[in-house]
Amino acid sequence: MASRIGIANDVTELIGNTPLVYLNSVAEGCVGRVAAKLEMMEPCSSVKDRIGFSMISDAEKKGLIKPGESVLIEPTSGNTGVGLAFTAAAKGYKLIITMPASMSIERRIILLAFGVELVLTDPAKGMKGAIAKAEEILAKTPNGYMLQQFENPANPKIHYETTGPEIWKGTEGKIDGFISGIGTGGTITGAGKYLKEQNPNVKLYGVEPVESAILSGGKPGPHKIQGIGAGFIPNVLETNLIDEVVQVSSDESIDMARLLAREEGLLVGISSGAAAAAAIKLAKRPENAGKLFVAVFPSFGERYLSTVLFDATRKEAESMTFEA
């Protein structure tokens, strides 16, 4: 990762140093301030660009993989696959991705464009199904190596080394609460640990779907917030760091994501809507008056054009005709 001064040596040096911006219109009625960490401004438009690079680089440094020889394998709901795909392309690796068939068509197209071998799995089996298929492929692939985002320490490590320090610097150390949707748990674990080391009073808030509230003691279930709520507690997630888990429904998340586009000019994915909805709930609590909350917006909305997020907009666009 570089400071973006001059010309980068390759695309991986463009990762990180994403901006922070206050939410204004959608945060009316809040007694605290809410800022968003715009991870959709990464080279391939999601926070997973960070871990795609970090997991491959870490394995290289340990001598576990070599370009042109090793075959990388990973189960993903989409964005980690894209983060791995552009790094693998830049470094010269073959990559096999397993992904639930319920993920957006945009993700399939992007992965294929990067030269990925894509294997779709039963959507009813969720991420567990994708993981099982990846393990099956690994067992029969010579020189195969699974990066294991849900277990790989290089996942939270990159957030400890980059995301956390960026937020601390960007807020001039004035952050009071950090909000992150929980998929692998890498972002909240890594960035959260760094922020708490700087100031133990910083509160960490995890966001999960109401429909699959595992962290809150509920059962896994189907939901529409792609990228979070995997249906199990990942090994890299340090739950002891989290001060509170905020539940947000799929409908709340979708409505907020649409509102962010119309009222803030921020075209974001559904999980960003979930993070914003959770942050606004927190910033409306009387005890949080004057406090600053930072929410991670993980991905760009253009990756979700075929999903429920843009159903009405897509139908309107498709029904339009030219004027004489």
From Swiss-Prot:
What cofactor does this one take?
A: pyridoxal 5'-phosphate
Under the heading InterPro entries, the entry gives: Cys_synth, Cys_Synth/Cystath_Beta-Synth, CysK, P-phosphate_BS, TrpB-like_PALP, TrpB-like_PALP_sf
- Enzyme Commission number(s) of this protein: 2.5.1.47
One Pfam family this chain carries? PALP
Q: Which UniProt keywords apply?
A: Amino-acid biosynthesis, Cysteine biosynthesis, Cytoplasm, Pyridoxal phosphate, Transferase
Catalyzed reactions per annotation: O-acetyl-L-serine + hydrogen sulfide = L-cysteine + acetate
Binding residue positions for pyridoxal 5'-phosphate: N79, G183, T184, G185, G186, T187, S271
Mind listing the GO molecular function terms for this protein?
cysteine synthase activity
Q: Per the UniProt entry, what is one GO biological process?
A: cysteine biosynthetic process from serine
Pathway field of the UniProt record reads: Amino-acid biosynthesis; L-cysteine biosynthesis; L-cysteine from L-serine: step 2/2
Question: Can you supply one Gene Ontology CC term for this chain's record?
Answer: cytoplasm
Determine if Transferase is one of this entry's keywords. yes
Protein localization:
Cytoplasm
PTM N6-(pyridoxal phosphate)lysine: list the residues: K48
Broad class of enzyme this protein falls into: transferase
| Known partners and oligomeric status | Homodimer.
NCBIfam families, sorted: cysK (TIGR01139), cysKM (TIGR01136)
**What family does this belong to?**
Belongs to the cysteine synthase/cystathionine beta-synthase family.
Protein's name according to its UniProt entry:
Cysteine synthase
